[in-house]
């Protein structure tokens, strides 16, 4: 059973309520979701609004720290109580939202919700935990140096989105992490934990009256306040091909993203371009995989993806060949991208992919938790809430002319960003000789310069 509404007696506590009932198992889940994530880092009241590095990572820092001391409990006491209840508590910060979630057996659920209520409303922000968290965040940045795929996406986003919010990493930088403090965390909490900025969601063996009771009983201290999600500006579209080589020593394999800016999720072109992108590189039998892996064995995987969110995201292809085959792989993907943009889908691709997307959609909404996550994201992004139900029919209605128009409008094969994590000395000379990169702008940056 599925319901979505804001009841009149809880509307002063939250901006929206989403419920996905499933009584097959005696498990319950309650979520509170902030309408903002790390894109808000440089706009929170009470903190420096200059756009400087000190603000990056604040949302992640402040929200994670809520988990480490709240109400009358220390971090250890929170963990001990959760263990005794067999409950799970998580806080996750993304660019577009922060998710607070508690899960437990139905018989222990209200006691578990009490802990979530303390975490959301009454964090103590202990100083010792603040310093421990700072050390952990810095250690995570050290670990990132060993994660070629993580480095690839970080540098690609920084280059593509520039100074706009999606160009800033969720967890910040070493410099910004060192500058984070408890005053900033308290200010972030005061500004963002307000009624109009929160969406409630529940899933599992729980009814709407029960959810409303929990909200009234345990979350009445959330102060009144408006939505805090400000529009996310789009970066300017740069002309010409750019090659960013993230220079890392002794790489035997290259990680490569080739992409561009894409339409907003709300744009009418988004769905036709999504259908076309999945046909191009979204399945194991797609053109990109077939040409790169099956026919030539250049990369174990080859995929293309169209992003979505509150702001304008990206379209990119991802491959990871050996170092000596980097130039050959880049040349091939560029040629395939050009062919895709100029000639569109091949015969049979559209019919196959429409059928594939309609059938596979069932797996994305298979469980109550899946549906809750999707519908929460839709509400955060101000998308139509019937999106999940109408998706198969809308995919079926995408025509060849819709796809042709979307591709003509959005695909920019001459203005692609090519980001490569590799050893520069081993790949740069061969890349510079490629005809498709003859006029490209090349830049080499150290892999640890993030």
Please state what every model-predicted region is.
Residues 396-407:
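A short, acidic, amphipathic alpha-helical segment used as a generic capping/interface helix at domain edges
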Residues 246, 406-409:
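Short proline/glycine-enriched turn/loop segments at secondary-structure junctions
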Residues 180-186:
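Active-site glycine-rich loop that binds ribose-phosphate moieties when present
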């Amino acid at each position: 059973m599925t319901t979505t509404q804001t009841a009149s007696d809880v509307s002063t506590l939250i901006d929206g309520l989403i419920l996905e009932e499933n009584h097959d198992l005696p498990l319950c889940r309650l979520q509170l979701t902030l309408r903002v994530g790390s894109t808000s880092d440089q706009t929170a009241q009470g903190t420096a609004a200059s756009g400087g590095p000190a603000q990056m990572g604040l949302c992640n820092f402040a929200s994670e720290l809520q988990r480490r001391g709240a109400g009358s409990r220390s971090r250890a006491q929170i963990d001990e109580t959760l263990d005794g209840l067999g409950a799970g508590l998580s806080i996750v910060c993304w660019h577009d939202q922060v998710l607070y979630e508690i899960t437990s057996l139905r018989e222990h659920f209200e006691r578990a919700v009490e802990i979530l209520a303390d975490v959301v409303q009454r964090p103590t922000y202990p100083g010792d935990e603040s310093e421990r968290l700072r050390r952990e965040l810095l250690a995570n940045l050290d670990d990132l140096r060993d994660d070629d795929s993580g480095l690839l996406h970080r540098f690609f986003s920084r280059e593509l989105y520039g100074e706009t919010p999606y160009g800033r990493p969720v967890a910040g930088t070493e410099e910004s992490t060192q500058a984070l403090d408890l005053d900033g965390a308290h200010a972030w909490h005061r500004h963002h934990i307000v009624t109009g900025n929160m969406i409630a969601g529940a899933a599992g063996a729980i009814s709407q009256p029960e959810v409303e009771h929990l909200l009234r009983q345990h979350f009445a201290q959330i102060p009144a306040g408006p939505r805090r999600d400000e529009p996310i500006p789009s970066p300017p579209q740069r002309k010409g091909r750019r090659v960013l080589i993230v220079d890392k020593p002794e790489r035997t394999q290259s990680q490569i993203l080739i992409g561009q800016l894409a339409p907003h999720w709300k744009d009418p072109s988004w769905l036709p371009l999504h259908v076309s992108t999945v046909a191009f590189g979204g399945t194991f039998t797609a053109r990109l995989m077939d040409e790169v892996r099956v026919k030539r064995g250049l990369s174990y995987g080859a995929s293309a993806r169209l992003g979505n969110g509150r702001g304008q995201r990206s379209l990119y292809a991802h491959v990871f060949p050996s170092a000596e085959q980097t130039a050959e792989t880049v040349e091939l993907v560029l040629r395939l991208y050009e062919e895709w943009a100029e000639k569109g889908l091949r015969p049979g691709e559209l019919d196959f992919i429409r059928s594939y997307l309609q059938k596979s959609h069932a797996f994305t909404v298979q469980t109550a938790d899946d549906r809750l996550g999707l519908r929460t994201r839709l509400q955060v992004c101000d998308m139509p809430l019937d999106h999940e139900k109408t998706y198969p029919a809308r995919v079926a209605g995408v025509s060849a002319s819709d796809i042709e128009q979307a591709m003509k409008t959005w695909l920019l094969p001459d203005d692609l960003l090519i980001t490569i994590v590799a050893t520069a000395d081993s790949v740069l000379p061969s890349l510079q000789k490629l005809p498709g990169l003859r006029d490209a702008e090349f830049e080499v940056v150290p892999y640890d310069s993030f």
